[in-house]
């Protein structure tokens, strides 16, 4: 190739010369190619003082181009060696994943876990227990702690053993005012349950309406008069409104003299030493009509329900 500047017109000639180097069948000298390229490179205008002798010619070894073009990439399956930083990170992660030693549980937690294993039902009873029943539980357990144990009392009263344990452990006792208030609330709860049973149809509905107060007054006066006659004669007067042809049921008092003592039927009122400070528990025989009349004025609906329960039978 003639010594001409490397321009766009001479690019094809240079590419053709490079292609000939890739094929070994064509004998091409690398020295002539290097000298031709060095001769075609011209310095820029800023370096006009420099002569072409300052440029070092390209020294390409023999068959270097062939080795570059026929190079086969080789991949290694061996993982690279870890650096010191990576090894320290791995050791820190392995130390953090180790389980920490468990701290000893406090005494209250140990007791709580033991109670959970022993009483699986928990302490919450399946039903509410009246104050009289709780007092009976305490008395029975004090009489014979082996026979009336926690398990036996729980099976008899249908509550959880944990509730029995807490009742026996409790040392709180209600005062006189608190006892009266508790009994009043318990009576209200009993009446509320009876009314709910009436609404569900499990009991006879009350014929008297709640909006008519005169009916309640009539019922209370009727009950008061029947109590007064009972106190004088000793028995109830015959009822004139009985249906004809239906024999009257005669009530015979039960003889309990030959009956054996059953400790499960003992209530707090039958036990000695039971404190009864409520005015409703200390009624005497002389004051019973007065007390019943006062209760009839307070709860006429309950009195009417009790009267109807003796006269009629449910349609179950």
Curated annotation (Swiss-Prot):
Coiled-coil intervals, chain numbering: none
Record keywords: Mitochondrion, Transit peptide
Any one Gene Ontology cellular component term annotated for this protein: mitochondrion
Cellular compartment(s): Mitochondrion
Principal localisation: mitochondrion
Ranges annotated as biased composition (Basic and acidic residues): 201-213, 241-263, 272-290, 302-316
Region (Disordered): 80-105, 197-316
Keyword Mitochondrion listed: yes
Transit peptide limits: 1-27
Highest rank taxon of the organism: Eukaryota
Keyword set includes Transit peptide: yes
Protein function: Required for respiratory activity and maintenance and expression of the mitochondrial genome.
Family: Belongs to the RRG9 family.
Protein name: Required for respiratory growth protein 9, mitochondrial
Organism the protein comes from: Arthroderma benhamiae (strain ATCC MYA-4681 / CBS 112371) (Trichophyton mentagrophytes)
Gene name, Swiss-Prot/TrEMBL: RRG9
């Amino acid at each position: 190739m003639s010594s001409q500047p490397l321009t766009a017109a001479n690019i094809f000639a240079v590419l053709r010369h490079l292609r000939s180097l890739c094929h070994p069948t064509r004998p091409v000298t690398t020295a002539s190619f290097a000298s031709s390229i060095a001769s075609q490179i011209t310095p820029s205008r800023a370096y006009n003082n420099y002569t072409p002798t300052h440029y070092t010619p390209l020294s390409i070894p023999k068959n270097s181009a062939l080795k570059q073009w026929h190079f086969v990439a080789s991949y290694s399956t061996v993982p690279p060696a870890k650096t010191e930083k990576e090894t320290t990170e791995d050791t820190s992660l392995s130390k953090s994943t180790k389980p920490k030693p468990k701290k000893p549980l406090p005494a209250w937690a140990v007791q709580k876990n033991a109670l959970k294993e022993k009483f699986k039902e928990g302490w919450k009873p399946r039903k509410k227990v009246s104050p009289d029943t709780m007092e009976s539980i305490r008395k029975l357990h004090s009489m014979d702690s082996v026979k009336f144990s926690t398990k036996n009392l729980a099976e008899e009263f249908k509550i959880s053993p944990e509730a029995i344990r807490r009742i026996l452990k409790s040392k709180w006792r209600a005062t006189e005012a608190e006892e009266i208030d508790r009994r009043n609330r318990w009576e209200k709860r009993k009446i509320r349950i009876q009314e709910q049973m009436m609404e569900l149809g499990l009991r006879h509905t009350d014929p008297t309406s709640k909006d008519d107060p005169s009916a309640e007054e009539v019922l209370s006066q009727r009950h008061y008069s029947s109590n007064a006659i009972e106190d004088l004669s000793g028995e109830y007067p015959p009822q004139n409104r009985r249906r004809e042809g239906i024999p009257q049921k005669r009530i015979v008092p039960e003889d309990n003299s030959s009956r054996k003592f059953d400790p499960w039927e003992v209530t707090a009122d039958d036990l000695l030493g039971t404190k009864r400070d409520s005015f409703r528990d200390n009624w005497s025989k002389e004051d019973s009509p007065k007390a019943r009349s006062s209760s009839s004025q307070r709860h006429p609906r309950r009195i009417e329900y009790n009267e109807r329960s003796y006269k009629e039978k449910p349609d179950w």
